[in-house]
Amino acid sequence: MTQPLDDAASAIFGPRLELAQCYADWLGTAGVERGLLGPREVDRLWERHVLNSAVIGELLDHGERVVDIGSGAGLPALPLAIARHDLQVVLLEPMLRRVEFLQEVVTDLGLAVEVVRGRAEERSVRERLGGSDAAVSRAVAALDKLAKWSMPLLKREGRMLAIKRGASSR
């Protein structure tokens, strides 16, 4: 990392920076090997993936329940869970190989994060995860489709936070 990235990472992750580094290591090795992240992304893991995901924590209140729709390799929710360990984070992912990767990472890092295999549009998922404070996602689908998936998972005042094309939108 460059000095500005070091400073940003320290500011965002504080005493949990080492956990964030371990997650970045997972992404750069097993994440690439298992096809969850392209090999060209390794050089920009921190700037484009880890930090870009963690900063949405500024939009969440203490202790909120957050569902990551289509977690994939754990972005944005794992950096968010590392930076904001007060949050109740649920990773929602339909693909078994990704779920297995996420469970391995969560266990290895000792994170209090729930991994659920399923799709947001499934009735059982809506019943289990409905009433959440926020739904987050990163490069999952068009916003209109994402809104259809997110709304049933949210409580009345809930928020959908989507990271699209390198920028965070609310």
Curated annotation (Swiss-Prot):
GO cellular component assignments: cytosol
Binding site for S-adenosyl-L-methionine: 70, 75, 120-121, 138
Molecular functions (GO terms): rRNA (guanine-N7-)-methyltransferase activity
Cross-referenced SUPFAM superfamilies: S-adenosyl-L-methionine-dependent methyltransferases
InterPro entries the UniProt entry points to: rRNA_ssu_MeTfrase_G, SAM-dependent_MTases_sf
Compartments where located: Cytoplasm
EC number(s) stated in the UniProt entry for this protein: 2.1.1.-
Predominant cellular place of this UniProt entry's protein: cytoplasm
NCBIfam families membership: rsmG_gidB
Protein name: Ribosomal RNA small subunit methyltransferase G
Organism: Mycobacterium ulcerans (strain Agy99)
